[in-house]
Amino acid sequence: MSLINANQPCIEFDDVVAGYKDFMILNNLSFKAKKGTITLLLGPNGAGKSTVLKTLFGLLKPRQGHILLDGFDVGGATQKQLLAQGIAFVPQGRNLFGQLSVFENLELGGITLGMKTTHERIPEVLEFFPRVKERINSAASALSGGEQKQLEIGRALLLRPKVILIDEPSIGLSPMVVADVFKLLRKLADHGTTVLMVEQNVKSALKISDEAIALESGRLVLQKPASELLADPHIERLFLGGAHTQAASANGAPTTASAAAAAP
């Protein structure tokens, strides 16, 4: 779906083990995501989806293996080095300063990202969000839920990132606003930004994604084009309900998870 022709992976997890103390969440995880694509991470709660984003953003260091961004090993990198590599993270929930204006939130967000000045980039970012632009002097708390999520994404875009990690962007948003957010992510990917996304709204997310990766207990159990998974009528039950998933055989046989989901 992406307009970018890039066979070389932008993101690569190679035998990654990561977790907290003695509890490992990612277990020998390996996968690749190409430049200018949207890769959707699927799986039940506790599968390790959000942990993938956290390890890539340096919030959790791998115990084993390598995480590469265009060949750069991010495993031992500092937050400053990761930002310099162009990795932006939009976590779950609301992470704004409610009493500050839209402009002030963007300005402070730029400072947090280590930028010396954001004045020239703020107008550039606001062009993506016409409704937010109209309320540039309004307090963030006065924005709708959708406008607040757009503002959070806008702060990430100040970095002009080559990779955006986004965790559950549809939470608390109306279907119309979710469609706008997804449309923006697709536009960014088509212009070269690599997007790694966790999203419970599986069918809608698959429609804008290029690849889908299914995790279970921190392990890769399936990776295939999103369009192929979208054709499965049991897709949401399959990847949110914890059914064990295995890749389809070369002759097109159904996955074991599809068979389980189809059973009465």
Name each region found by the language model.
Residues 57:
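Helix-to-loop junction immediately C-terminal to a conserved catalytic motif
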Residues 139-143, 147:
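Conserved ABC ATPase signature
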Residues 42-44:
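The feature captures the beta-strand-to-loop junction immediately N-terminal to the Walker
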Residues 160:
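Conserved catalytic motifs of ABC-family nucleotide-binding domains
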Residues 156-157:
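ABC ATPase C-loop
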Residues 65-73, 85, 118-120:
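Conserved ABC transporter NBD signature motif
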Residues 21, 39, 100-120, 128-133, ...:
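ABC-type ATPase nucleotide-binding domains, specifically the catalytic core motifs of the NBD
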